[in-house]
Amino acid sequence: MGKLYVVPTPVGNLEDMTFRAIRVLKEADLILAEDTRTSGILLKHYEIKNAMQSHHKFNEHKTVEGVVNRIKAGETVALISDAGTPGISDPGFLVVRECVRNGIEVQCLPGATAFVPALVASGLPDERFCFEGFLPQKKGRVTRLTSLQEEKRTMIFYESPYRLVKTLTQFAEFFGAERPVSVCREISKMHEESVRGTLTEVIAHFTENEPRGEIVIVLGGKED
């Protein structure tokens, strides 16, 4: 029986790729990629020419069985996403779950994920936190925010630049305008930026300065 490797890839800076990740990808019989075009750039940079197959949220229900069968037959499969660690607000959970159910060994390499550097650099308490990822866009959004109003741990969210100000404004309504927050964007890239302050202050900043790039919001928990 083969093995499934979950391989983190850089969230921005290609220098963040680990030696081990490169080796695993070069040795894999098959690489599952969220977007073969995006991953193709990374693989070309490191001269990795192994077979690659598309595996994303729109097709993973159909591809999982075939992948599991290939691993059972002895192949080594590596799973990557466009950026960061697969399964963290990215495709990956389904194939990992099916491998575990079928007694297949799963190894997740340590490596890049956007929320850890955003949390550590935020200046907010990081000994206890909860990761919420992307909030529901419509159904369930208010319910989710309501459930977090009494949360005392630091909270972490992912958001698109187009919805950032709207989401921060909603946070001010649910958590109070003076709640501390840190918004980190373009992590590890040339224009990386962290904007810290109260929700009121950070909303004002991004109202005047249109946000771009990938966004991580780190929100302080409710104080006693």
Model-derived features: positions:
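Short active-site oxyanion
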Residues: 25-31, 103-106, 154-155
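Glycine-rich, flexible N-terminal cofactor/catalytic loop recognition
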Residues: 1-57
